[in-house]
Amino acid sequence: MGEQPIFSTRAHVFQIDPNTKKNWVPTSKHAVTVSYFYDSTRNVYRIISLDGSKAIINSTITPNMTFTKTSQKFGQWADSRANTVYGLGFSSEHHLSKFAEKFQEFKEAARLAKEKSQEKMELTSTPSQESAGGDLQSPLTPESINGTDDERTPDVTQNSEPRAEPAQNALPFSHSAGDRTQGLSHASSAISKHWEAELATLKGNNAKLTAALLESTANVKQWKQQLAAYQEEAERLHKRVTELECVSSQANAVHSHKTELSQTVQELEETLKVKEEEIERLKQEIDNARELQEQRDSLTQKLQEVEIRNKDLEGQLSELEQRLEKSQSEQDAFRSNLKTLLEILDGKIFELTELRDNLAKLLECS
């Protein structure tokens, strides 16, 4: 097409099985480049992928297309024009998301382009209908001629209805066959000019495509010549390398043996260094173990001393408990004796009180 890709990525390409409509059929043995292109001639966006010189994807993006993510690394879309469903397997979820974003972006661009094309058609058809007395249909644009089937179908539907109306619309404005003939003549002239312009556009596009094809053919021939020259140079260098290998085989053997010895010595030195480091580590561990043993012995001795001290304290505690019990017993006996004395004292006091009262009575009587 001559355009540069807008966005490219790599993926494994699949198509739905036309028989079962369920299974995926791989169309590429390995990951291939899948690119978005903008066709300025037809004002459309395309998805194109080549496997060598074979086009395995050539899909025009239309506003009614939808790209669906069916898994983290796989997506698909249906192309009604090609009557198939394409599937792409990506190496990562990021690549899939990026491709889906671009698909949505170019789908929106295709929708806007289609709306602009329809607006242009309406603006162009309005003056034509007025000048012909409502006798002309909407002229076709290059986009409607060169676009997809989805884009062309609405144009045919819209333009098919006015074809049956020119005579009816012309009746209120003309009442003679001469006027109708003149209107048809003007309409035919306008349509002829329009198709002449379309033909010139198509010829220009054909010339561009022919030039691009010739350029591609010339490039292929040039690449084939360069490839042949590279192959001859590679064969010559291969022969030269073989000769040099034969001449320097002995030197290479000595050098190889020397290299092996050097590597062996280096490996032994590294092994010895590792062993020395291991010995130092073991010595350090032994010293640490000795220190731990000394600390353990010291702690064991302290523990024994603490246990002896604990036993002494337990003996003292037992003796104090016995003394406390004895003291409590003595205190209880003292309290009992004291209570007995208080009771005796109360009795004596009562007797003395009675004696006093009796003496007082005697004194009063005498």
UniProtKB/Swiss-Prot annotation:
Coiled-coil residues: 193-364
Ranges of Polar residues composition bias in the record: 138-147
Domain topic, free-text comment: The WH1 domain interacts with the PPXXF motif in GRM1, GRM5, RYR1, RYR2, ITPR1, SHANK 1 and SHANK3. The coiled-Coil domain forms an antiparallel tetrameric arrangement.
Tissue and organ distribution: Highly expressed in cortex, Purkinje cells of the cerebellum, hippocampus, striatum and olfactory bulb. Isoform 1 and isoform 3 are expressed in skeletal and cardiac muscle.
Compartment(s) of residence: Cytoplasm; Postsynaptic density; Synapse; Cell projection, Dendritic spine
Gene name tied to this protein: Homer1
Modified positions (N-acetylglycine) in chain numbering: 2
InterPro entries membership: Homer, Homer_EVH1, PH-like_dom_sf, WH1/EVH1_dom
Domain WH1: 1-110
GO MF annotation: an example: G protein-coupled glutamate receptor binding
Gene3D superfamilies per UniProt: 1.20.5.1700, Pleckstrin-homology domain (PH domain)/Phosphotyrosine-binding domain (PTB) (2.30.29.30)
Record PTM Phosphoserine, positions in chain: 318
Disulfide bridges in this chain: none
Effect of substituting residue 89 to N: Eliminates binding to both GRM1 and SHANK3
Family: Belongs to the Homer family.
Top-level taxon of the source organism: Eukaryota
Biological-process GO terms, alphabetical: behavioral response to cocaine; circadian rhythm; G protein-coupled glutamate receptor signaling pathway; positive regulation of calcium ion transport; protein localization to synapse; protein tetramerization; regulation of calcium ion import; regulation of dendritic spine maintenance
Keyword Phosphoprotein set for record: yes
UniProt keywords, alphabetically: Acetylation, Cell projection, Coiled coil, Cytoplasm, Phosphoprotein, Synapse
Protein name: Homer protein homolog 1
Keyword Cytoplasm: yes
Ranges where the record places region Required for tetramerization: 302-366
Effect of residue 344 to R: Dimeric form. Does not form the high-order complex with SHANK1. Does not change its interaction with STX12. Reduces localization to the spine. Affects dendritic spine structure. Decreases synaptic transmission
Region (Disordered): 114-189
Outcome when changing residue 76 to A: Normal binding
Effect upon mutating residue 24 to A: Disrupts binding to both GRM1 and SHANK3. Does not form the high-order complex with SHANK1
Organism: Rattus norvegicus
